Amino acid sequence: MILLRAAHFALVVALAGGLAFMLCVARPALAQAAPHWLELRERLTRFALWDLALVAASGALWFVVRAAEMSGVSLSDARTPRFLGAVLEETLFGRLSLGRLALAAALGGALLALRRARPRQETLLLALSTALAVGLLASLAAAGHGVSEEGVDRAIHFSADAVHLLGVGAWLGALPVLALVLARTAPQVGLQFATAVVRRFSAFGMISVAALALSGVVNAAYTLGSLPALIGTSYGRLLCAKLTLFAAMVAFAAANRWRWTPRLAQAARAEALLALARLRRNTLAETALGVVTLGIAGALGVMVPAADTQTIWPFSRTLDWSAVAAPRQVLFAIGFASAAALAAVVVGVRARSTEWIVGGIAVTAGAGVAAIWLLAVPAYPTTYLHSPVSYSVASVARGAPLYAEQCAVCHGAFGYGDGPGATALAARPPYLTPRVTARREGELLWRLGHAGEPNERLADAQRFDLLNYLRALANADAARRLDTQAEPWRPVSAPDFTFQISTGPQELLAQERGRRLVLLVLYSRRHSLARLRALAESKPRLDRLGVRVLAVPLTPADAVAADAGGIDPGMIATPDASLVPVYAMFTRTIVEDRQIAVRHLEFLIDRQGYLRARAMDPGAAQWSSMAELLRQAVILDREKQRLPAPRRHAH
């Protein structure tokens, strides 16, 4: 499958690149040599037709294999007309294949007409053929990872894939034709023609490399997820190999542009012929590297992106900006020295000065070593690992007994290091809250599994739940300063939970992110009915401000009927069973550093998923007036957007 995909991509790349080379490079360069142009046009058009035939054959085979893979049937069963017809009609891949087949058929007709075209028709037919080939190449983006995104991300990723393919076609696809022209046409027409072709192609190539670099950065943002994934995942390591080959291709292209092309026009004939031979050799080397790169791209296209896998760090050290003990100005000085040294290398290359080149490289290497020494910190295999378990009340509730059994005896109920077993230790256990917020998720998971406490009897799933409980402890500590005022902002993430309104579908709190504010009301029959009726009366105004009210009972016995008088049934929710005990963790205050037995509890949650305000009495002075609650909602509605609260632990 990988080889078939890579072969098909390579054939389409060569087809589009060859036609683009004819239109934008060869034809303008041979404007004064009509017989040579006609001969080259005939040869390249014939090659394009053969290439198109191979594209059609490989595309048909790829379609059959892919259809069998998607449906889980054998190749023999996948070759039946009925099965293939169903795939063509009922799947996105099939409909895209039909569209690509139509493009290929139109391209075949345009190429046949181009072979017999008169000079007046030639430009139009060549431009049409190139446009159809470019469309065929860009359509391959539909086979990339971009189509798995949604909304705006899908449009951006898909567009970046298409631009990347076009850049590959314009550069790599044109290299075989350039090598052919330099080997056959240039000796016949002259060195002046070779110079014009290479210079035109250099400009063409620089635009292509820029497009490849920019689109590659966008693609990496979606498929990598983080820089450590370049080293810590199979996808990232294969991408590193691709980038290495790309850098080698750029080096050959730079040698052609800055060293050998000037010698074609300025040197004696013998040296010019040597330069022409070097240009051909480097072009063939670029082509060979490009073919291997396409093979790697074919493998990357069918692999799970690094962003969707776990990063396993292979080294005992990593780099961390926050670890710098020296003043940050030292790093800026190192960066300035590196930039100056690189500039010296560029000057040395242009001036052909060995001293400048060697000196610049030495300073750059020294600055790099100094930066690594300053930023290096200990690392573990799980340093960049992310828990697959989201921060939810269900996970926190599962982690609570684990903490009580494994940690509380030394660390205490709230992680202060004041547990009953702490006095028997040589050193007091550390205060957990700052450690939880300051360390990466993967580092915490490693310590949970390898430190003295808890021991390795915990399974992976238990470690993930224990980590979420520790995160809830840290958030509850930060929430001690919450009151009925939404400002100032504090990084207190609201644990996610499921709920159901009447007989409607189950929903998640996280689904309200970016959409509405949430007023979460934990009520009791004895103390909250008047408050619920007041909220129901103000619901139209709350709706206009984008505030959704979710009222859940403190105990099952407190649940009110959906048809209770004066209470809006759209507010009454059946919650996750773990919601009340987990959100009760957020009742600690600066005055009372313990969980308070509440009769009524309200949280105002912003659109990013952060707890912003809290009222722990149905008659709280600030919220007893509905106007004050509405004022807090207006403040949140108008404030500048922040990054959403992480659904997992964030460093």
Feature-to-residue mapping (PLM):
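Short active-site neighborhood of thiol/selenol oxidoreductases, capturing the structured segment around
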Residues: 286, 508-536
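Periplasmic/extracellular electron-transfer cofactor-ligation site
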Residues: 394, 404-427, 450-451, 473-478
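The canonical Cys-X-X-Cys-His
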Residues: 286, 291, 399, 404-413, ...
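Structural microenvironment flanking redox-active thiols in thiol-disulfide oxidoreductases
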Residues: 526-580, 651
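Polytopic transmembrane helical bundles with strong interfacial aromatic enrichment
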Residues: 1-375, 380-382
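Thiol-/selenol-based redox modules, centered on thioredoxin-like
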Residues: 479-488, 593-651
